[in-house]
Amino acid sequence: MILSDRSIRELIEKGELKVEPYEPSHVQCSSLDLRLGNQIALYEGEGVIDVKKGTKGVRILEFEEYFDIMPKQFLLATTLEYISLPPYVTAFVEGRSSLGRLGLFIENAGWVDAGFEGQITLELFNANDRPIRLYRGMRICQLVFARLDRPPERVYSGKYKGQKGVVPSRIHMDEELKSE
């Protein structure tokens, strides 16, 4: 079941859903708006990115006020908010329609597991033929929360739990990709 604004506020007030910093006006009728943090990560260099060897050639940058995402550019960004989901709530990350109408695609693989905590790393892609300027602290995406039908056997304890700042791919840590 998708959570309403009342349920979202109730979970935050009880301390079961943690959002830091929390801005009450960002609770919408069925979602919570999250803001853009101050870090981006750019993939640089040439050649193949080998998923077994980890991410090389990633440059993490901090910005004060804004940055421009160039046409057809892909980069990682992070939310300003650090969130902590209770073990019975999952969330979907959705881009804001107003930004999508500019050609900005916002993802994070779209899913936040129950029990996750950390800042959310976002994948941004500018499909426009013009640069798009994004500002630190602007509302960038929204979380849609859903209550699980029953408690999970195990909550999220993966490689991104507790992440702060923009975090590049850690796919090389997946069990099936580890070198023998």
From Swiss-Prot:
GO BP terms in the entry: dUMP biosynthetic process; dUTP biosynthetic process; nucleobase-containing small molecule interconversion
Swiss-Prot/TrEMBL site (Important for bifunctional activity) positions: 110-111
Catalytic activity of the protein: dCTP + 2 H2O = dUMP + NH4(+) + diphosphate
Top-level taxon: Bacteria
UniProt binding sites for dCTP: 96-101, 113, 121-123, 142, 156, 163
Active site: 123
EC class: hydrolase
A Pfam family of this chain: DCD
Sorted UniProt keywords: Hydrolase, Nucleotide metabolism, Nucleotide-binding
Pathway(s) of this molecule: Pyrimidine metabolism; dUMP biosynthesis; dUMP from dCTP: step 1/1
GO terms assigned for molecular function: dCTP deaminase (dUMP-forming) activity; dCTP deaminase activity; nucleotide binding
EC number: 3.5.4.30
Keyword Ribonucleoprotein among record annotations: no
Assembly behavior: Homotrimer.
Described purpose of this protein according to its UniProt entry: Bifunctional enzyme that catalyzes both the deamination of dCTP to dUTP and the hydrolysis of dUTP to dUMP without releasing the toxic dUTP intermediate.
Family membership: Belongs to the dCTP deaminase family.
HAMAP family reported for this sequence: dCTP_deaminase
Protein name, entry field: dCTP deaminase, dUMP-forming
Native source species: Aquifex aeolicus (strain VF5)
Gene this chain is encoded by: dcd
